[in-house]
From Swiss-Prot:
Belongs to the DXR family. Its EC number is 1.1.1.267. Pathway: Isoprenoid biosynthesis; isopentenyl diphosphate biosynthesis via DXP pathway; isopentenyl diphosphate from 1-deoxy-D-xylulose 5-phosphate: step 1/6. 1-deoxy-D-xylulose 5-phosphate binds at K114, S134, E135, S158, H181, S194, N199, K200, E203. It is an enzyme of class 1 (oxidoreductase). It comes from Helicobacter pylori (strain ATCC 700392 / 26695). This is 1-deoxy-D-xylulose 5-phosphate reductoisomerase. It catalyses: 2-C-methyl-D-erythritol 4-phosphate + NADP(+) = 1-deoxy-D-xylulose 5-phosphate + NADPH + H(+). Signal peptide: none annotated. Pfam families: DXP_redisom_C, DXP_reductoisom, DXPR_C. InterPro entries: DXP_reductoisomerase, DXP_reductoisomerase_C, DXP_reductoisomerase_N, DXPR_C, DXPR_C_sf, NAD(P)-bd_dom_sf. It comes from the Bacteria. The lineage of its organism: Bacteria, Pseudomonadati, Campylobacterota, Epsilonproteobacteria, Campylobacterales.
Amino acid sequence: MVVLGSTGSIGKNALKIAKKFGIEIEALSCGKNIALINEQIQVFKPKKVAILDPSDLNDLEPLGAEVFVGLEGIDAMIEECTSNLVLNAIVGVAGLKASFKSLQRNKKLALANKESLVSAGHLLDISQITPIDSEHFGLWALLQNKTLKPKSLIISASGGAFRDTPLEFIPIQNAQNALKHPNWSMGSKITIDSASMVNKLFEILETYWLFGASLKIDALIERSSIVHALVEFEDNSIIAHLASADMQLPISYAIDPKLASLSASIKPLDLYALSAIKFEPISMERYTLWCYKDLLLENPKLGVVLNASNEVAMEKFLNKEIAFGGLIQTISQALESYDKMPFKLSSLEEVLELDKEVRERFKNVAGV
């Protein structure tokens, strides 16, 4: 298999599972963590390696592997790989081209890069994609029951770092506080997306493309991150998917469902410890971006605008140029600006063009 973004949280877990399953790693790619990819090269002996920045070439120790550089290099590497499976754990819209290239080459795509579906779900062959996400894995598992007819799909949110912060203090929060996730250990972008509820807007759009534009789609807060997804059926019964908060479960099924079903990759649940589970609505007062959920479901191509404005605002937030309120404000302004515009977006080039336009337009918006 090929692992793109091998030095991140998902990538590291994927390599752990590949080793457990005895799967050979043909190629690896990383962004800036050259020290870690050097370690991974020693353990997994890939035939090909891609790094983002040519200035890191001197520090790379490829041990005879063919080396590729930049986003174009990742594309060229995928083109040459013979593996049937590509796991895309690249963060941000940078991973979009890699998803397209993998599907063009008729490879199975294990997808942790949310931005691919959020920005271009209408252009991707969903039948070749397995999402790496606890909520979508939960929905997939629940929808295996073909006798019952689904009516609505519900995914859960933890509430993120500011779920108990007094409302008046939320706009002035900094990145350091936003990174204190109550349940999950994840990369910085997805942890902050969890605090803003952008992550759940992403997952709502992913659900739309993956499982059914015709079904009602919603989310709720379940603080323990034990209930990942629920499906309500036409007979008004509801089935929930419960599992420990551990990404190794969806990763293992994305890599090899058969092997994943034969052995445990996560610790068992203690049912007697689950008495505290309760469901809460997502408050628009606390999570102001949640008010755009219905707009995004009505016009899912707005996902390009959501993602581009979020990435621009995220960079400024992490660089301490704006506070949390400024991040929210930038995304709101972007969605309000584009919500009446008709989008065709009939090619990857058009998606990337709109992405670039939104970034240019909102990179200098003054924030809180």
